[in-house]
Regions:
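N-terminal leader segment of winged-helix/HTH proteins
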Residues: 1-35, 39, 167
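Charged, amphipathic alpha-helical coiled-coil/dimerization segments
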Residues: 75-131
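Short leucine-rich amphipathic alpha-helices used at interfaces
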Residues: 12-13, 19-20, 30, 94-95, ...
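C-terminal ligand-sensing/allosteric alpha-helical core of TetR-family HTH transcriptional regulators
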Residues: 12-23, 27, 44, 110, ...
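N-terminal helix-turn-helix DNA-binding core of bacterial DNA-binding proteins
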Residues: 27-66
Length: 167
């Protein structure tokens, strides 16, 4: 593919990607509403399901909240029965948080429609195309986490610069 072909295609891809991300966020909100939660709750539970039990600090890093905000989040989720705290099997002095699995009914209500719709989409892809998608997501998730860290770092630096200039 020539650079002349690639440029417009990348522009179209960026636009479609933004639309996809918006759809993901909106579905996360709908899933949260279905479960009687807010989107941050769902993202925290997803992080725990993907990583397994985490300390509050480890969860904070994965969901982008401060440690104190994450502690309040975990307190609220624990009271509601969505997570439980327990000793870290590797270091019993530490406490870890783990997600309480959704019931099959909760899982179906919140995520069943998305699973079915995405299965329909994936049915239209060959095995080779699915491998490309897998490779994309495998590389895109860490790239977005790095971009998030860079963006947050830049935002903190900009905030500090504004604060110094205001004196």
């Amino acid at each position: 593919m020539s650079d002349q072909e690639r440029g417009p295609l990348l522009g179209q891809l960026a636009r479609i990607y933004r639309d996809y991300l918006t759809a993901v966020v909106l579905h996360g909100q709908a899933a949260a509403e279905t479960l009687g939660q807010n989107p941050t709750d769902v993202y925290a539970l997803n992080a725990l399901e993907l990583a397994g039990p985490l300390t509050t600090g480890g969860l904070a890093e994965r969901i982008g909240l401060s440690q104190s905000a994450t502690t309040r989040l975990v307190d609220r989720l624990e009271r509601a029965g969505w997570v439980r705290r327990g000793p870290d099997p590797g270091d019993r002095r530490r406490v870890v948080v783990e997600a309480v699995p959704l019931t099959p009914e909760q899982d179906e209500a919140a995520f069943g429609a998305a699973r079915r719709r995405m299965a329909e989409v994936f049915d239209g892809f060959s095995a080779d195309e699915l491998r490309v998608l897998f490779r994309y997501f495998e590389q895109a998730a860490p790239a977005l986490r790095e971009a998030t860290a860079e963006t947050r770092s830049g935002a903190r630096a900009a905030t500090k610069g504004r604060a110094k200039g205001a004196r």
